[in-house]
Structures are given as C-alpha cells and as structure tokens.
Amino acid sequence: MKLDDRKQKVLLAIVHDYIATAEPVGSRTIAKKYKLGVSPATIRNEMADLEEMGYIEQPHTSAGRIPSERGYRYYVDYLMKRQELSREEEELIRREYEAKVRDVGQVIQKTGQLLSQLTNYTAVVLSPQIESSRFKYIQLVSMHPSQAMVIVVMDNGIVHNRMIEVPESITCADMETISRVLNAKLRGLTMESIRLTLMKEIYFELARHKHILDLAMELIQDSLLHKVEDKIYLGGVFNMLNQPEFHDVEKVKTLLGILEQEKLLRDLITSGGSEEGVTVRIGGEIMHEDIRECSMVTAPYSVCGRKIGSLGVLGPTRMEYAKVVSVVDFMTKNLSQVLERIVRGTGR
C-alpha cells in the first residue's frame, strides 16, 4: 500500500535518523531536525499510524521508534535516493583494479577488500563459477622425463596448473598431440557439457596412439571433470563488530560462526537474487534465523554477458542502503569490465 506524502516524509526521517544514530527516534527530534512544517503532535499522530501499519516499531526500553523490516523495505523500494560514489572513491576502485588486472584471483580478493573499505560492512565475493565457465585451452608442458605440467585455461580467466606423473615413454610430440585433440574437441564447452559422449569421441580420436590414450583420459577426468568448489572471499569481517547491534557477545559468536561456513555464504549470496542488477534482502527475507538482524545487498557479475559469479555486502538492517547499493552496483560493473579485459588478454 502506498503511503500518503506526510507519512512518507515521517518514515523517511525516522529511517535516516536511525541509520545515522542507532538511537530510537522521537517526534520532537523529527520536528527539530527535519523541518516537515508540522507540529510534534501531528508527527506523533503520523507515527502512531505508521506503527499500527507495521512500518515502525517501539523497542522495549525506549519511548522512540525505529523502522521495522517492512519500513526498511518501503524505504528501499519507494523513498531511497542512491548516494553516488565520490570521484575519489571511483578513482580508487579503478586504480586498484588496474594494479591487479592480469590475475583473476587477486582481482576477486581486491574486490572484497574494496567493498568492505567503502561500505564499512562485511563483503562476500564468490569467485567465478567453474561449472558455468567455458573451456578455452589446455597445454601439457614437459618438466622432467616423468613429469609434466597441465595448464587449463577457462574463458573467464581462471587458470589451473597441475603437476602430473607421466610415463617416460611419453614424448613432447605426444603431449602436443594430446593437447591438440583435447583443444579441438573441448574448446567453448562448459564443464557441465564435457561428459561421457565427448570422452568417447576423444577415445576414438586417440585410439591409434595407444601409448598416450590412458594419459589423455586421465587428464580429462582429473583436470577437467574434477569438481572444484567456487571460492568465497571475505573482506572486513570485523567491521560488523563495530556496529551497536553486535556488541552482544552471543550475537558476535553467531555471526562469526556464519562467516566461517562457506556453503552457507555461497547459498546466501546466490539465492534470492536477480539475474542482473542489485538485490536488497532485509532481515527475514534472507531466510536464515541467525541473521534476522542483518540485511544483504548482492549483485551478479558477468563476462561477455554471461553471469559467472556474485558479490555482496552483509550489514545490520540499519545499514546505509543508499550508499551500499551504489557501491555494489558500481563495483559489479567495473569488476565485469576488468574480467573481460583479462579474458581477451587486452590488459588495460
């Protein structure tokens, strides 16, 4: 239900003041600070209506009011005006990304650090997802008579290096043959699509090279089909402890316990979000009882128009949504651009 203009102004004042001070807000405070052009008595009446409608609530120990989850949701959906990044903040992001522009892992790690630095909350970044990435090429490099390095490169810039044992009878020419066949058959395919049928094709392609067939099959199984979990990068873990909501020891223990659970964090950052753009989930919308007092702002990042990972910010429900949404949006777009440059090999 859409609120009338005066109720919107009162709700906006309560949200802004509570975000800034972490103190319940009274009618006199609103009348003095926000110049709404009405008396404290009128503001009290509007606050009573807002409370009855579920947009604000009264803490047990205070005469003031604070926004409810419903109030925050109304604010984010209808009242919030984004707080754009300063020129200095935008330049900081671009400068830091340019310094790490050739290494995907470092770029993702730096993203977590920047998100937490710019928001003063906890950042969660999911690395590019292996299962949805596409195979670019594989190369076998002889290191010793019985050892070789396998280099697997994905189209999102991820590079896997592994040392493997090889029979001494395998020559550099054999390794080139394996690399050539695998590259011809696998290039452009996702990890999900490299399955049994394709392995049969490769088997028949290399059947005349009996001495290298087993090695090729082993490479596909171990280097390409091996399940690799997407990494979670955290930034500013202890930022949340500076928030008044988390001065309670038990709440701190619960929060830190959650931040240690990678599977849970992976679910939190990937579930409930849109395929593009920024998603804001408030309190109970996160669907996890232990962090009902938190909100999460998330967005996917992409390469060449394909979603490959997600990033987000975890903070109290009293978070600065206007700033956080802008930071997440700006960084998502810049991260996508940087990863595309890495994939294309164009550097800066």
From Swiss-Prot:
The keyword Transcription applies. Coiled coil: none annotated. GO terms for biological process: negative regulation of DNA-templated transcription. GO terms for molecular function: DNA binding. Keywords: Repressor, Stress response, Transcription, Transcription regulation. Pfam families: HrcA. The keyword Transcription regulation applies. Negative regulator of class I heat shock genes (grpE-dnaK-dnaJ and groELS operons). Prevents heat-shock induction of these operons. Belongs to the HrcA family. PANTHER family: HEAT-INDUCIBLE TRANSCRIPTION REPRESSOR HRCA (PTHR34824:SF1). This is Heat-inducible transcription repressor HrcA. The lineage of its organism: Bacteria, Bacillati, Bacillota, Clostridia, Eubacteriales. The gene is hrcA.
